[in-house]
């Protein structure tokens, strides 16, 4: 009888410990290697280009940064704006720039109100030489 009580207490203690570790792991924030210098982009109607500063926060590994524009429904678009360069390598701990350039079709947008687009920046990690490694590409999406 005493062994059964101790086993139940042990199982209860281990279950509580596992639950606490799981909850603690869920609460850990994900840190992006590629950081953007702002939370939104204001593209005034008379501007031709807007420069965004990005930086690789990882001090050991280079990352690729891929940028594109989406409309308000989340569809990837090629006009009236384009991202230059669409893909670039950012060295460890170094800054870089991404430019959003307006195309001639931008002149057809309404000038008396805002039009919503989204700027997306995806970080692509370098290929790992270790077997059985899970790599995650984080993406930042901000209003434009």
Task: Indicate residue ranges for each PLM-predicted region.
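Terminal connector regions
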Residues: 105-144
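Bacterial N-terminal signal peptides that target proteins for export
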Residues: 2-18
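N-terminal signal peptide c-region/cleavage motif recognized by signal peptidases
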Residues: 27-29
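Intrinsically disordered, low-complexity Pro/Gly/Ser/Thr-rich segments with frequent PxxP/GP/PP motifs
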Residues: 75-107
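Extracytoplasmic
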Residues: 47-49, 62, 95, 114-116, ...
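Short acidic, flexible loop segments centered on an aromatic residue
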Residues: 58-75
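Buried hydrophobic-core signal for structured, non-transmembrane domains
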Residues: 50-56, 100, 117-122
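Beta-sheet-dominated interaction scaffolds and their linkers
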Residues: 31-55
């Amino acid at each position: 009888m005493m062994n059964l009580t101790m086993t139940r207490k042990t199982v209860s203690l281990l279950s509580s410990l596992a639950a606490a570790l799981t909850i603690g792991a869920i609460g850990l924030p994900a840190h992006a290697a590629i950081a953007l210098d702002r939370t939104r982009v204001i593209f005034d109607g008379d501007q031709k280009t807007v420069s965004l500063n990005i930086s690789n926060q990882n001090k050991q590994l280079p990352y690729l940064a891929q940028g594109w524009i989406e409309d308000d429904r989340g569809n990837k678009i090629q006009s009236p704006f384009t991202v230059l360069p669409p893909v670039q390598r950012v060295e460890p701990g170094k800054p870089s720039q991404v430019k959003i350039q307006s195309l001639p079709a931008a002149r057809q947008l309404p000038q008396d109100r805002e039009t919503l687009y989204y700027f997306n920046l995806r970080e692509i990690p370098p290929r790992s030489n270790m077997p059985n490694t899970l790599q995650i590409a984080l993406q930042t999406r901000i209003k434009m």
